[in-house]
Each structure stands twice: as structure tokens, then as C-alpha cells.
């Protein structure tokens, strides 16, 4: 535990404008309902531009045509991205068919994007289709409440179909945590579902009238898999089992990856171990962590508002003691746990329940019908006959779960027919990931999703050239320092700096338990590949048995490990 810099429990000073917006929003209503009927613009204006995020949407535009439209004196082509709340990533085939049809009929791009937070996004919903989108989700038994902005976001849960009973228990807790921490305001139901307006004052007993200081992310993790990247999250419940039965959780708090270029007061941070709790205290601890962050988080500076900064300011032990006090629970010592990897097991695996589970690799999570590979149609065809469920993974893949032996051949035939199973996909491609970035993300500084496939092809060539064709490096590209692509937990992480330029980070590990350090700043893809070629050449010759690339570059002295990111993340480390 690190108590080097204890500071004030509450940061004084002028509140950020985001706090004003929330306090004046009437519990997230704003004037969204009126704005919906304003046909003079395709977007939401004023505070509503940000308030719609609490309702699961971001206002975006097509940046590929932004300049062209400006020349024509037209406003940007505004469209919304809508993100579903899907704790643990489980969705039924019937629900899938509903979202498949909506994407085809009512979005500009016609695609479904599986995210690395185990849900799906629609991109390109025009303003007139926004309300029908929410109503469709509601008809399917889904919603988009609290999938963005200053609330507890979609709760992740390890996708472990083999240990079916344990996964089911963990998944149930992910759902309970999600429901417990949801906003209580009726704004979502009133605006999107035409719920009757009730003459009572809204109350937010957990989140408070101005909600949280910043976004808050929660996971339920089943070791030895760390597919959900717990160190990217504010609150983590690491499953502890006895004889295959869930008995409690190790609790880790204060992870997070987003930074701001040029601002050394921002840094990534691994989550800190608080201790072990039995199952019965799970919701009390979740609530206590959230309310402590609600009350102590920095509301004067949004760049310094996340839980990780609160922990560094007040000290881990102080924060932990407050959580114990609020929950009326004392943490026990952490129970032993270990992570061995993060990747999904692509292909068929048989669970202890004798059912089969097929993990389909979906490059960058983008389901669309491409020439010769009708991926989106293929998943829909599987949904028409599948009797189990679908599970969206934190690696942006799709699991067809709970397949009886008699249906296995038929489902595989459909998957192969539509290009969803490809025996030629390399381990390197399976272990590479990017955020959406251009053309829809307004924060994008460099390409990510559109850049990754060809970049991976070139990395595959380097591995093959050095006799490592069957090896892989955990490779991630994020289009800006907000870090949605989780590049700052990769062995090789690219963080977008400008169009065509990235900061290159090296030295994470395969398990996702070490933050990579910046090795080169603001360089091109060609420069990155040249460095990769040189270092992979050394890795091929000098590595120990089963030594991953990230571990190798640390051991070989290419770069020093990040030990305490709040203090050493920006230390300059010259290559040896």
C-alpha cells in the first residue's frame, strides 16, 4: 500500500462545468425531450450534447466528410452512437435478431460493433431514429441506461464457458451489481419510453444528485483468466471458489488507463488490493466504494476525477478504511489468485455441463457483411437455430454458448459458410485489438480500427521472418489517450498522437498485470515496424522458454518496468 502523498479528502475550488450541467439537469432530463423535436439540426445542443451520454449515447459525425460539408456550408452529419447495457455480455438469440434488424434498417453503417466492454454499439443513428432505438431495446428486454458518463458503466464478467456453474454464479453477481448501482431517475423511462411523469422528486441514494465525479467501471473476474483487464477498472471483484463453488471475492480498487497527452498529472494505474469478502457483503462493498468516490472524488478537474487519483490523493489505507466504515464490513486478507492469460479460446470447447461453446474471432468486433464474408448475416443465421445464448467477450469476440452435441455440426457449417470460422487466422491477429476511432469517434487523433488489420499483417510477416509464426504479441491500438483500446495494458501499445503518428509503449505482459512504458513518442507506423523487427529479432534469439515479448524487453533491458505508475510512468528510459 502506498501512502506517500496523503492529501485532502475533498478537493476544494470551483466546480467543473460538468458539475453545473448535472446539477441543473433535473436528474438527467435537461431539455432532451424538446431537443428531439428540433428539426433544424441533426444534433443535440447545449447541455443535451453531454446529457445524452447518461442515456447511453454519444453524438458523433462522419469525420471523413466533415471538411467537405463545411465547404458546402452544411453542419456536420450528426448521428448518435448508442451503447447497450449488457452486464456480463450475455444476450439471447431472439434479442440478437432484433438488434440485427435494427442495425440494418435504421443506422447509417448497417453494422453491429462488439466492444471490449462486453456489449454492442450501433453507430450512425440519425436523430429521428434515436427514440425508436431505445424503444426497440426496451421491447427486447434491454436498455442503454448508464452506459456512458459519470455513472457505473456496463459491468464486465469473465467469459468462461467451460466452468459453466461458476460462470453462472459470477454472471448473476455482475447483474446484481449493475442493477444495484443504476441511476434511479425516471428520466430515461420518461424521455424514451413515454413513461408517465410522476409528481415526485427523484432521489439518487447511491449516486447522488450530481452523480459521480467521473466514469466508473466494474468487473467480476474469474481467475486464471484476466480477459476483462481488471487493472483498467475502478472496482473489481475477483472470484474465489472452493470445490467449484463461488464463496467470495478479492476486491481490487482504483485501476484505470486514460491519460491526457502532455499532462503528467494524469497517468494509468493498476488497481490496489483491498482484501477478501464473503459473497453476502458484495453489494454493500460495491456501494461503499462508489459512495466514497462520489464524496471524495475531484469535482474541480475532470482530468483528475477518477477513482485512481482519489486513491493516490488520500492514500489507499484511508480510502479502504472509509469503505469498511460505510459498509460495516472488514476486509480479510487477500486469498491467493493468479492470472495466466487474457485471450479467448477461439473455436470449440466443451464445458463441464457437457455442452459445447464456440468462440468466433470477430476482428475488431465489427459485424458487417463484407465481400465473401457475410459475418453479420452469419451470426443472424446462427441465431435463428441456436437454443443457448450468445456471449460478447471483452476481447470483442462472440461465443455461441450452450450448444448441444446434435446442433454442433450445423452451427459450424453456418459459421464456415459465412466466414466466421477461418483456420488461417493467426494467434497474432487473435491477440490484437483496437478501439473504433475514425471516422466516427470525435476524440480520435489517429486511426485504430481501420489501421489495425493491415498493421497486423505486417507484424505477422515480421514474426514469420524470425521463425515465430506461431507466436504472438499482445498488441493494441487506441486512437487517443483516453485508452478505450486498452493499449496501456498491452505488450506493445500504440496510443494515437496525430494522424499517422503514435506513441509506442513497450513492456506490458500477457497477463495484463504490468503497464507498458513509452519507448518512442510521435512516430509513424513504418518506424514502429522497424523497431518491432529489431526487437522481435532479438526476442527470437535471446528469449527464455515460453518468455513473452513484454517480459523479454524488460529482462533484456530494452525498457524499464513501470513499478509505481503515479511516480515513475513518465520517467525517461533510454534503450540499452
Curated annotation (Swiss-Prot):
EC code(s) of this entry: 1.8.1.2
SUPFAM superfamilies assigned to the protein according to its UniProt record, in alphabetical order: Nitrite and sulphite reductase 4Fe-4S domain-like, Nitrite/Sulfite reductase N-terminal domain-like
GO CC annotations, alphabetized: sulfite reductase complex (NADPH)
Claim: Isomerase is one of the keywords in the record: no
Top-level EC class: oxidoreductase
Binding site for siroheme: 484
Free-text cofactor note: Binds 1 siroheme per subunit.
GO biological process terms on file: cysteine biosynthetic process; hydrogen sulfide biosynthetic process; sulfate assimilation
Keyword NADP: yes
Catalytic function, reaction form: hydrogen sulfide + 3 NADP(+) + 3 H2O = sulfite + 3 NADPH + 4 H(+)
This protein's UniProt keywords: 4Fe-4S, Amino-acid biosynthesis, Cysteine biosynthesis, Heme, Iron, Iron-sulfur, Metal-binding, NADP, Oxidoreductase
Pathway note: Sulfur metabolism; hydrogen sulfide biosynthesis; hydrogen sulfide from sulfite (NADPH route): step 1/1
S-S pairs: none
Protein's job: Component of the sulfite reductase complex that catalyzes the 6-electron reduction of sulfite to sulfide. This is one of several activities required for the biosynthesis of L-cysteine from sulfate.
Oligomeric form and interacting partners: Alpha(8)-beta(8). The alpha component is a flavoprotein, the beta component is a hemoprotein.
PANTHER family the UniProt entry points to: SULFITE REDUCTASE [NADPH] SUBUNIT BETA, SULFITE REDUCTASE [NADPH] SUBUNIT BETA-RELATED
Family stated for the protein in its record: Belongs to the nitrite and sulfite reductase 4Fe-4S domain family.
Protein name stated in the entry: Sulfite reductase [NADPH] hemoprotein beta-component
Lineage, highest ranks first: Bacteria, Pseudomonadati, Pseudomonadota, Gammaproteobacteria, Enterobacterales
Gene: cysI
Amino acid at each position: 500500500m502506498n501512502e506517500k502523498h496523503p492529501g485532502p479528502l475533498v478537493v476544494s475550488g470551483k466546480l467543473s462545468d460538468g458539475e453545473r450541467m448535472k446539477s441543473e439537469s433535473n436528474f438527467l432530463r435537461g431539455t432532451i425531450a424538446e431537443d428531439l423535436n428540433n428539426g433544424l439540426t441533426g444534433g443535440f445542443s447545449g447541455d443535451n450534447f453531454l446529457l445524452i451520454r447518461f442515456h447511453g449515447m454519444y453524438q458523433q459525425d462522419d469525420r471523413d466528410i466533415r471538411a467537405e460539408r463545411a465547404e458546402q456550408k452544411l453542419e456536420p452529419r450528426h448521428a448518435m452512437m448508442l451503447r447497450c447495457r449488457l452486464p456480463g455480455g450475455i444476450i439471447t438469440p431472439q434479442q440478437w435478431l432484433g438488434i440485427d434488424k435494427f442495425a440494418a434498417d435504421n443506422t447509417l453503417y448497417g453494422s453491429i460493433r462488439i466492444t471490449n466492454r462486453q456489449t454492442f454499439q450501433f453507430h450512425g443513428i440519425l436523430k429521428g431514429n434515436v427514440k425508436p432505438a431505445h424503444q426497440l431495446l426496451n421491447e427486447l428486454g434491454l436498455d442503454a441506461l448508464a452506459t456512458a458518463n459519470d455513472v457505473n458503466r456496463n459491468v464486465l464478467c469473465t467469459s468462461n464457458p467451460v466452468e459453466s456453474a461458476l460462470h453462472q454464479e459470477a454472471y448473476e453477481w455482475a447483474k446484481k451489481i449493475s442493477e444495484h448501482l443504476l441511476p434511479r431517475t425516471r428520466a430515461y423511462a420518461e424521455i424514451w419510453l413515454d413513461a408517465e411523469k410522476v409528481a415526485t422528486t427523484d432521489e439518487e441514494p447511491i449516486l447522488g444528485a450530481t452523480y459521480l465525479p467521473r466514469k466508473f467501471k466494474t468487473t467480476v473476474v474469474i481467475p486464471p483468466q484476466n480477459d476483462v483487464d481488471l487493472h483498467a477498472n475502478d472496482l473489481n471483484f475477483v472470484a474465489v471458489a472452493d470445490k467449484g463453488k463461488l464463496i467470495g471475492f478479492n476486491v481490487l480498487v482504483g485501476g484505470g488507463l486514460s491519460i491526457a497527452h502532455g499532462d503528467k498529472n494524469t497517468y494509468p494505474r493498476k488497481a490496489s488490493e483491498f482484501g477478501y469478502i464473503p459473497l453476502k457483503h458484495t453489494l454493500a462493498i460495491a456501494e461503499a466504494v462508489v459512495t466514497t468516490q462520489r464524496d471524495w472524488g475531484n469535482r474541480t478537474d475532470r482530468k483528475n476525477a477518477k477513482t485512481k487519483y482519489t486513491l493516490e490523493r488520500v492514500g489507499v489505507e484511508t480510502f479502504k478504511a472509509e469503505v469498511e466504515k460505510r459498509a460495516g464490513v472488514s476486509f480479510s486478507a487477500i486469498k491467493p489468485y493468479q492470472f495466466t492469460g487474457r485471450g479467448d479460446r477461439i473455436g470449440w470447447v466443451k464445458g463441464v455441463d457437457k455442452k459445447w461453446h464456440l468462440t468466433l474471432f470477430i476482428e475488431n468486433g465489427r459485424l458487417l457483411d463484407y465481400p465473401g464474408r457475410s459475418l453479420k448475416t452469419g451470426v443472424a443465421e446462427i441465431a435463428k437455430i441456436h437454443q443457448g445464448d450468445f456471449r460478447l467477450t471483452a476481447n470483442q469476440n462472440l461465443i455461441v454458448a450452450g450448444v448441444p452435441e446434435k446442433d454442433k455440426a450445423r452451427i459450424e457449417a453456418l459459421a464456415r459458410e459465412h466466414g466466421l470460422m477461418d483456420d488461417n487466422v493467426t494467434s497474432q491477429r487473435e491477440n490484437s485489438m483496437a478501439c473504433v476511432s475514425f471516422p466516427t469517434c470525435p476524440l480520435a487523433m489517429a486511426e485504430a480500427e481501420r489501421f489495425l488489420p493491415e498493421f497486423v499483417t505486417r507484424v505477422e510477416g515480421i514474426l514469420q521472418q524470425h521463425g515465430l509464426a506461431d507466436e504472438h504479441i499482445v498488441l493494441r491500438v487506441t486512437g487517443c489517450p483516453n485508452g478505450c483500446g486498452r493499449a496501456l495494458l498491452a505488450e506493445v501499445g500504440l496510443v494515437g498522437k496525430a494522424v499517422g503518428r503514435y506513441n509506442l509503449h513497450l513492456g506490458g505482459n500477457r497477463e495484463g498485470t504490468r503497464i507498458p512504458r513509452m519507448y518512442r513518442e510521435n512516430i509513424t507506423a513504418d518506424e514502429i515496424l522497424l523497431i518491432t523487427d529489431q526487437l522481435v529479432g532479438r526476442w527470437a534469439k535471446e528469449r527464455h522458454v515460453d518468455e513473452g515479448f513484454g517480459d523479454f524487453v524488460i529482462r533484456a533491458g530494452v525498457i524499464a518496468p513501470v513499478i509505481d505508475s503515479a511516480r515513475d510512468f513518465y520517467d525517461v528510459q533510454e534503450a540499452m
